[in-house]
């Protein structure tokens, strides 16, 4: 190991410890300048390339997944440790597949599956960006589809479609009535604010 202080190539190991994450920490001393420094040894993993929707290929990035999860879980009761655990689980899944290339669509589905177990609202947020809906109508239809709603517990839902249903019924009422006659606005059921 090259000394970071003088550049000399010879050193001796004073102490070796295995860390909780499986890496090895070594305390070293340069034989030339007697400076001490620490090194950490970890296994180098070869991540596959990601094939994007437009056909581009880019290296797998844990940071990108972390950033997407943090945005989806913003202001939700999800800890950073939980998010990190999901990132590590997805990374391990990607490596264990043993492929040199993997589609971004497949990774997106895996992220959605993990978020589905973690937090309902974060799952909906991620799905709304990942699925790239062309308009609100398509988003509402997808929400009504079992694919996105099968996770909502009927006894204690975190997400209510009442307001979305109300908006859709109001749109259809406006199309049926004369455009000169304004339709009366009503509120969806729920708590009133003063």
From Swiss-Prot:
InterPro entries: ATP-cone_dom (IPR005144), NrdR-like_N (IPR055173), RNR_NrdR-like (IPR003796). PROSITE patterns: ATP_CONE. One of its GO terms (biological process) is negative regulation of DNA-templated transcription. Coiled coil: none annotated. Residues 185-194 have a biased composition (Pro residues). Residues 168-179 have a biased composition (Basic and acidic residues). Binds 1 zinc ion. Residues 48-138 form the ATP-cone domain. Keywords: ATP-binding, DNA-binding, Metal-binding, Nucleotide-binding, Repressor, Transcription, Transcription regulation, Zinc, Zinc-finger. GO terms for molecular function: ATP binding; DNA binding; zinc ion binding. Residues 168-194 are annotated as: Disordered. It holds the Pfam family ATP-cone. The keyword Transport does not apply. A zinc finger (unnamed) spans 3-33. Its cofactor is Zn(2+). Negatively regulates transcription of bacterial ribonucleotide reductase nrd genes and operons by binding to NrdR-boxes. Belongs to the NrdR family. This is Transcriptional repressor NrdR. It comes from Bdellovibrio bacteriovorus (strain ATCC 15356 / DSM 50701 / NCIMB 9529 / HD100).
């Amino acid at each position: 190991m090259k000394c970071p202080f003088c550049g000399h190539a010879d050193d001796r190991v004073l102490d070796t410890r295995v860390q909780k994450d499986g890496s090895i920490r070594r305390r070293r001393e340069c034989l030339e300048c007697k400076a001490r420094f620490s090194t950490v040894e970890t296994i180098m993993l070869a991540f596959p390339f990601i094939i994007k929707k437009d056909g581009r290929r880019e290296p797998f990035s844990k940071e990108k997944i972390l950033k997407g999860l943090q945005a989806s879980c913003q202001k939700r009761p999800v800890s950073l440790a939980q998010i990190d655990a999901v990132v590590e689980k997805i990374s391990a899944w990607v490596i264990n597949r043993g492929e040199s290339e993997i589609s971004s669509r497949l990774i997106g589905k895996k992220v959605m599956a993990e978020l589905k177990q973690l937090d309902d609202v974060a799952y909906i947020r991620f799905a709304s960006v990942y699925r790239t809906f062309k308009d609100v109508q398509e988003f509402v239809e997808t929400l009504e589809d079992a694919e996105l709603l099968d996770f909502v517990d009927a006894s204690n839902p975190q997400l209510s479609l009442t307001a979305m249903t109300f908006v859709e019924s109001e749109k259809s009422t406006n199309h049926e009535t004369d455009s000169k006659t304004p339709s009366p606005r009503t509120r969806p059921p729920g708590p009133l604010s003063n």
